[in-house]
């Protein structure tokens, strides 16, 4: 008789274990980060380790390389961060901070894992040594100024030509 009483109990435990087995893979899948989320977490780590006064924010993320499906395997990443106006001591997220005009730009390379439970990254960042990065900013600003100047000149020519049209006397 004791065996019969424990029989349904054993069946319930089997059912509970079966349900847990079905639910656990879903919980594991939910802990996998997207490529960009993993990079943003790495940037948070960079900001925590940095001795610079201000936070850095993602400026450019290189295209995602082809990867295997294992979230525990380190994935190669490369991206660019730029200094923001927010001090490191702020509680703001870097995404909520504006970029600092002429802020320091750093090129970062390394690896991240997409498994949120492991949350590991190995990233190193160096000053962006692209010589023409600031030159590009110069040309953008010059283009705006020249565009505004040409617009003003065009308006003056239009006004001048409008005044040359013979007026009819009434």
Curated annotation (Swiss-Prot):
Residues 1-30 form the signal peptide. It is found in: Secreted; Vesicle. GO terms for cellular component: extracellular space; vesicle. The keyword Signal applies. Residues 31-131 form a propeptide. Residues 150-162 are annotated as: Active core. Belongs to the cathelicidin family. Antimicrobial protein that is an integral component of the innate immune system. Binds to bacterial lipopolysaccharides (LPS). Acts via neutrophil N-formyl peptide receptors to enhance the release of CXCL2. Postsecretory processing generates multiple cathelicidin antimicrobial peptides with various lengths which act as a topical antimicrobial defense in sweat on skin. The unprocessed precursor form, cathelicidin antimicrobial peptide, inhibits the growth of Gram-negative E.coli and E.aerogenes with efficiencies comparable to that of the mature peptide LL-37 (in vitro). The cathelin-like domain (CLD), which is the propeptide part, does not seem to exhibit auto-inhibitory function, as it does not inhibit the antibacterial activity of antibacterial peptide LL-37. This is Cathelicidin antimicrobial peptide.
């Amino acid at each position: 008789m004791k065996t019969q009483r424990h029989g349904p109990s054993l069946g319930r435990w089997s059912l509970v274990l079966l349900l847990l087995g079905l639910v656990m893979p879903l919980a594991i899948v939910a802990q996998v980060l997207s490529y960009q989320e993993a990079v943003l977490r790495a940037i948070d780590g960079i900001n925590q380790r940095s001795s610079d006064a201000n936070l850095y924010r993602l400026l450019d993320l290189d295209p995602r390389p082809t990867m295997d499906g294992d979230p525990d395997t380190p994935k190669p990443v490369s991206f660019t961060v730029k200094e923001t106006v927010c001090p490191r001591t702020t509680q703001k997220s870097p995404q909520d901070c504006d970029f600092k005009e002429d802020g320091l730009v750093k090129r970062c390379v390394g690896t991240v894992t997409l498994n949120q439970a492991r949350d590991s990254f190995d990233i190193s960042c160096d000053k962006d040594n692209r010589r023409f990065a600031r030159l590009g900013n110069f040309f953008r600003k010059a283009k705006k100024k020249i565009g505004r100047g040409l617009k003003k000149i065009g308006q003056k020519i239009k006004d001048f030509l409008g005044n040359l049209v013979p007026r009819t006397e009434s």
